[in-house]
Amino acid sequence: AVILDPGCADPFYRRSVRVSLGHVMAVPTIHAASLPGDLAVLHDHGIATVALTPSAPQRLHEVDPAALPARAGGSIDSSQRPRVAIVVGAEGPGLTAPTITACTARAAIEMAAGVDSLNVATALAIALHQLQIGR
């Protein structure tokens, strides 16, 4: 599913639907009232959250989904497959400080020297792939 904060573009805008070849209609979307606050709902349901931010001390390839508690200081249930939500911000400003703080982990994508950022879609694709192969 995709959780959208109030500042996100409309995923059902005509051009979005067209460039996604209609696949946007197959992905569940949720409109959050307040992203930092609504992340607690994910945590309450056992879903850990990883904020992608270039300033994170940990690199994405170092994140072990099985070692992430659903909330900071929480316990880890090793009997279940880890459930992780990747949290990304807008291109340019990135995530807000309150959103980064609300996440249970922070990670950065390692990039070549001189590259300071990635397109949000590219960053998310890399993160989802990395977490999938890490399982």
Go through the PLM ranges and name each one.
Residues 1-135:
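Post-transcriptional modification and biogenesis factors for structured RNAs
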